[in-house]
Curated annotation (Swiss-Prot):
Protein name per Swiss-Prot or TrEMBL: O-phosphoserine--tRNA(Cys) ligase
Binding annotation for substrate: 186-188, 231-233, 273-274, 325
UniProt effect for mutating residue 423 to V: Shows higher activity than the E418N/E420N mutant with both suppressor tRNA(Opal) and tRNA(Amber), and the activity with tRNA(Opal) and tRNA(Amber) is almost 30% of that of the wild-type SepRS with tRNA(Cys)
Outcome when changing residue 418 to N: Shows reduced phosphoserine ligation activity. Shows appreciable ligation activity with both suppressor tRNA(Opal) and tRNA(Amber), and reduces ligation activity with tRNA(Cys)
One of the record's GO molecular function terms: identical protein binding
Recorded superkingdom: Archaea
Effect of residue 420 to N: Shows reduced phosphoserine ligation activity. Shows appreciable ligation activity with both suppressor tRNA(Opal) and tRNA(Amber), and reduces ligation activity with tRNA(Cys)
The protein's assembly and partners: Homotetramer. Interacts with SepCysS.
Organism: Archaeoglobus fulgidus (strain ATCC 49558 / DSM 4304 / JCM 9628 / NBRC 100126 / VC-16)
């Protein structure tokens, strides 16, 4: 808290040691929920896919390639121009875009009567007919239709939507009609379009890259395939090119991701947009794969493909220079870098069960439920803890004064007591601490047996006696406010977090159960606090 510098300068001149020790007084007593690990600075997390995309962007830029955005929605004629006779087989893998046709909407006398029944007023059909006519011609967008109908009929939007739904069923009967537009199934489709505009205008060599989505109509999604994926693709345009240029680009790019050795093999697929015998598979060795549980446990994986575009395909776009194209799937690279064996779990962790909370994440959500609201209340809680620690093993019956002082204008005395005979002031579990270890929550003593839980897990810093003391101090505060003369608070067997005045957010509790984890805080606390208020 704020302090007076002059006071401390004068105190230091008189007695530096005393001034130094007095420094503690500027540290305010904090609520237990404002103590670490419950207090911390949160930060966002990168998605592994987009983190890999960013690294790929930097890698391409570092070897002199410039970034472009290629067309994503393309006419199917481009696939036919690039693939020739193979086009139909390729188009079978493409998603075609469909649109809803704009219906011819007629306004009959019957429909006018229906509208008047809804609006409770006479309706002029001409302005309404004009709106539907403009909508049919494409002058009005569909999302503006209900607004404009409401405007000409002088009704609210809800009534306009009701009119469309009940009076004009032709809108509900519309069926999509396919167009000739497709979603790009691979980046090559976009490269031909891009290069057709710049290949004869920029100085050679032209070095471009693009990292963007492609869409492929797979039979279904599984551990290795999704309907949409990211392609990290580049082109090199020059008068003199060979397969060796592709090898050089592949090595320069992939070495930046930890790949160490490379093998190149002719691809048996022989796509028609590549010159024969130039389509090449790139195999690379990565030490992270060695000994893994995947089929790449020897460290080698097919990671990229390159080739030189065929002049028969380039000629369709009047591109007069050879073009080397290299591409790799970002998802495959990200799976290697982040250790995934299922692309669905990596791309859609929120859907495919890979949500992860660390022990620290869980520990941060374990909080004290009832907390004293005054500085005196916090001091009472601390006094209860100190008294319990000092006299925990004293034989009963026994009583120890923990605090005496003023609260809310009243004199308060707080005792830690045990009235039953032949026991101790505190039960055996009073010093158990709540610890999060490997996703589970435990209440355990700080002994050699449990050392690994404290060292490898995340201790919350809250013992059973701490949680109970805060609760007892809060009850003393409430008693003082209500002008009660006495209050007694007892703790017995602990079964749940709530028994020691702790709680955890329901979402985190569900996460632990979903992961088949456990919350085990059972133990005998047996502590009683009694307060006298005058």
């Amino acid at each position: 808290m704020k302090f007076d510098p002059q006071k401390y300068r004068e105190l230091a001149e008189k007695d530096f040691e005393a001034a130094w020790k007095a420094g503690k007084e500027i540290l305010a007593e904090r609520s237990p929920n404002e103590l670490y690990p419950r207090v911390g600075f949160s930060f966002g997390k990168e998605h592994p896919l987009f983190a890999t995309i960013q690294r790929l962007r930097e890698a391409y830029l570092s070897i002199g390639f410039s970034e472009v955005v290629n067309p994503l929605i393309v006419e199917d004629v481009h696939v036919k121009k690039q693939f020739g006779r193979e086009a139909l087989a390729v188009l079978d893998r493409c998603f075609y875009l469909a649109t809803l046709p704009k219906p011819n909407v007629g306004i009959s006398a019957e429909k006018i009567r229906q509208i008047e029944a809804i609006t409770k007023r006479e309706v002029d059909s001409k302005p309404l007919q004009e709106i539907f006519h403009r909508y049919k011609k494409g002058e009005i967008d569909g999302d503006d239709l209900s607004y404009l109908i409401a405007e000409v009929l002088d009704v609210d939007d809800i009534t306009a939507v009701k009119i469309l739904d009940e009076v004009f069923p032709e809108f509900k009967e519309l069926k999509p009609i396919s167009s000739t537009l497709t979603l790009r199934s691979h980046m090559t489709t976009g490269w031909f379009i891009t290069l057709s505009h710049i290949a004869d205008k920029l100085p050679l060599p032209i070095k471009l890259f693009s990292i963007d989505r492609c869409f492929r109509r797979e039979q279904g999604e599984d551990a290795t395939r999704l309907y949409t994926y990211f392609s990290a693709s580049c082109v090199l345009v020059d008068e003199e090119l060979s397969v060796d240029d592709g090898k050089a680009v592949a090595e320069a790019l992939l070495r930046q991701f930890g790949f160490e050795n490379f093998r190149f093999r002719k691809d048996e697929k022989r796509s028609k947009y590549y010159i024969p015998d130039t389509q090449t598979e790139v195999f690379a060795f990565h030490p992270k794969l060695v000994g893994s549980s995947t089929k790449y446990s020897d460290g080698w994986i097919e990671i990229a493909t390159f080739g030189i575009y065929s002049p028969t395909a380039l000629a369709e776009y009047d591109i007069p220079y050879p073009v080397m194209n290299l591409g790799l799937g970002v998802e495959r690279l990200a799976m290697i870098l982040y250790g995934y064996d299922d692309v669905r779990k990596m791309v859609y962790p929120q859907i495919h069960g890979e949500i992860k909370l660390s022990d620290l994440d869980i520990a941060r959500e374990i909080k004290v439920k009832e907390v004293p609201q005054t500085a005196v209340g916090l001091k009472i809680a601390q006094s209860i803890v100190e008294t319990a620690e000092k006299h925990a093993s004293e034989p009963s019956p026994c009583s120890f004064l923990a605090f005496e002082g003023e609260m809310m204008g009243r004199n308060v005395r707080v005792y830690v007591v045990e009235e039953e005979e032949n026991t101790k002031l505190c039960g055996p579990a009073y010093a158990n601490e709540v610890v999060v270890y490997k996703g589970d929550i435990y209440g355990i003593p700080k002994t050699k047996k449990w050392r690994s839980f404290f060292e490898e897990g995340v201790p919350t810093g809250i013992r059973y006696i701490d949680g109970f003391a805060y609760y007892a101090a809060r009850k003393v505060e409430e008693a003082a406010m209500r002008e009660q003369e006495e209050v007694k608070v007892k703790a017995r067997i602990v079964e749940n977090l709530s028994d020691i005045n702790l709680y955890i957010h329901e979402n985190v509790r569900r996460y632990i159960l979903w992961k088949k984890g456990k919350i085990d805080v059972r133990g005998p606390l047996f502590v009683t606090v009694k307060a006298e208020i005058e």
